[in-house]
Amino acid sequence: KIFFFFLIVGFHPSYSVALNIKKLIQEKRRLENLTKVKVQINRFHFLKFSFPQSFQMLEQIGITSDYSLGYSHYIGFRASTCTPFYFYDLVQDRISSLKLHPLVIMDVTLKKYMGKSSEELFDIMSEYAEKIKEVNGEFVSLFHNESLSDDNFWSGWREQYQKAIRYISLLEIYDKEEALEKSR
């Protein structure tokens, strides 16, 4: 038996359901039945969504937070902000109950589309984390399990990711210099 005490279970619907509410409901229900947890957060596969329909459907099925708002080919702030905000439904002219959490960095973006190496990862992540801290924003990154596997294609990435996460965690508490010193 699996116990879910301090875990948050997120929804990662299959690629084909971004505009199919029936399949979206079916997949979410299946996940909730398996985990016995009410699922309230989401990230679309390949960051694929259709504006505004996908966000409207998420709200309809009880999702309260989404983490799909990022670039697949670039790093940076797709919504021009690193601060979560409620989706404004232009069709219904209202603020929805769905909070969007902008995604700033994704592993595949760095390696595949931007040609970055593992040696560059720490500097890139720490630079964004420092900028985000200055405005009290939220640092949302996306790293897939295979990029942390240290296999041939991703060799060196896990170590640099761990180093960056350690620094970013300390940056929550300390200033830049102290966080850097303590992360070594």
Label each PLM-derived region with a short phrase.
Residues F4-F6, E119-R184:
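C-terminal domain-boundary segment and adjacent tail
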Residues K1, Y15-L24, R43-P52, H73-R78, ...:
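Acidic-and-aromatic substrate-binding clefts and catalytic sites of carbohydrate-active enzymes
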Residues K1-V39:
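Acidic, glycine-rich loop-and-beta core segments that form the ion-binding/anion-interacting portion
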Residues F11, F44, S141-F143:
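Conserved beta-strand positions
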